[in-house]
């Protein structure tokens, strides 16, 4: 016969587990309802995905999608208004800020990979990125093999850091890595001649080139170094909020909104300088819309 102490311990453990699960399942939605607000993590220089337009205003492809998502959730919660607080994040602090509750939903340029998925959750992907190389047009650099002995910039805290080292080992090409604190800083390293190349997501490269003083002075070259799903990030222990986000994403896709959003942010003049990024819709991104999923980058790069 089971002792009273064991029965009591089991009951307490069960109650605690139920309480934790209930709290975890509804934490973000309850916070939104009780406070009337939500905190969105945004980037400052990830044009056209997530960036500042000045005066503490933020916009971009992922930012607009997140506003649509939050609007849908607001309506489902029966709220008349929902205040969105914007919290700038960096490549270094974005994951910790989601983990500790400072940021409720991160709408930037974060790659969904298995390492990060141990700490945070990812919504279904609406943008599939290709990592490329940006150089000065007159550099003579055409591929990663031409980077031998060169200085190559990338942004601290991004997957491109590990990617560079992987390609360096695999191809026997030795180059010096230099790091920018954010994407604008990394591009400045290339612009000022302190780096010979900048390796990063193609959209970020194209956005920074379009935003530069002389866009014709730069070009994107070489092979695709990696294919990466860029996804909206949420807390790992809040499956109910992730489900609400994914339900809103499914509605946006079903209502045919995605092609218009792509044209607006990648193929049309965008604020504040009316630059045109000029990045065509890729088959991989189009497929992600047609087959919504939260697969990590490792699944995209299987040989």
Regions found by a protein language model. Name each.
Residues 39-48, 58-75, 111, 128-183, ...:
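Bilobed "Venus flytrap"/periplasmic-binding protein-like clamshell domains
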Residues 29, 109, 117-126, 220-222, ...:
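A structural signal for short loop-to-beta-strand junctions that line the ligand-binding cleft
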Residues 24-106:
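Extracytoplasmic small-molecule ligand-binding "clamshell" domains
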Residues 93, 107-118, 163-170, 188-192, ...:
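A ligand-binding cleft/hinge motif common to bilobed small-molecule-binding domains
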Residues 79-146, 286-297:
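Acidic, polar ligand-binding/catalytic clefts
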Residues 33, 162-178, 216-218, 249-303:
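Ligand-binding clefts/hinges and TM-proximal coupling segments of bilobed small-molecule sensing domains
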Residues 64-72, 145, 150-151, 156-158, ...:
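Extended ligand-binding regions for polar small-molecule ligands
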Residues 44, 127-138, 202, 210-249, ...:
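Periplasmic-binding protein-like
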């Amino acid at each position: 016969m089971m002792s009273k102490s064991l029965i009591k311990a089991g009951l307490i453990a069960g109650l605690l587990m139920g309480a934790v699960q209930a709290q975890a399942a509804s934490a973000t939605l309850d916070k939104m309802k009780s406070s009337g607000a939500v905190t969105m993590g945004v980037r400052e220089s990830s044009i056209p995905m997530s960036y500042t337009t000045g005066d503490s205003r933020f916009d971009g492809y992922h930012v607009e999608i997140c506003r649509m998502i939050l609007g849908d959730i607001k309506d489902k919660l029966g709220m008349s208004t929902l205040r969105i607080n914007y919290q700038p994040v960096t490549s270094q602090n974005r994951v910790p800020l989601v983990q500790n509750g400072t940021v409720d939903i991160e709408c930037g340029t974060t790659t969904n990979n298995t390492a990060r998925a141990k700490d945070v959750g990812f919504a279904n992907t609406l943008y599939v990125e290709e990592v490329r190389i940006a150089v000065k047009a007159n550099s003579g650099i055409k591929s990663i093999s031409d980077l031998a002995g060169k200085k190559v910039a990338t942004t601290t805290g991004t997957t491109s850091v590990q990617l560079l080292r992987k390609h360096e080992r695999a191809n026997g090409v030795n180059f010096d890595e230099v790091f920018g604190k954010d994407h604008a800083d990394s591009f400045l390293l290339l612009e000022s001649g302190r780096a010979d190349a900048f390796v990063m997501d193609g959209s970020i490269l194209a956005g920074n080139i379009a935003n530069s003083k002389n866009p014709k002075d730069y070009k994107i070259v070489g092979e695709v170094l990696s294919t990466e799903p860029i996804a909206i990030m949420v807390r790992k222990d809040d499956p109910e909020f992730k489900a609400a986000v994914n339900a809103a994403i499914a509605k946006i896709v079903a209502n045919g909104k995605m092609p218009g959003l792509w044209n607006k942010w990648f193929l049309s003049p965008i604020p504040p300088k009316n630059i045109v990024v000029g990045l065509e819709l890729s088959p991989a991104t189009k497929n992600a819309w047609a087959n919504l999923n939260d697969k990590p980058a490792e699944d995209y790069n299987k040989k």
